[in-house]
């Protein structure tokens, strides 16, 4: 495949077939807004789980997809959402791998990129990925009304934002604060609206 090897159990060839199509779409379209094409990455499929998730990790460098559909997701195919979201993380991380951080990968291997990723706020990485999954599909979390519910609740209760940035950033056990996906999507959306593609 153009994006790398796909590893899956033998009985899951139908899931792998669909996922391959979504990954090919994502691999062509996700890098365009960052102007960076990443190196191919292995994809590991986990079809037998009650969880629904995916992640990209750099030690060793790979993407893992748990193919069980999320019960809270949009009607869009779950594998498409995951493909777009996780591909964005691949492009983000690969783009950060330059300069002094690239030199660190020669010394530390795949883990040399960790300091660069650690310097970027989690809300920015996740918000950018949610923004991408929403823009490149007809679904995505950015189109779900439940995704905005914490913000609506806060504004209806208080009329304006009464919390400092740190509280929005770190969350709270006392007050309902949006998670880093929701907060990041709103921040990144505003960033793209104001600065267009110069946000990165």
Regions found by a protein language model. Give the residues of each.
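Juxtacatalytic substrate-recognition/specificity segment
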Residues: 1-115, 121
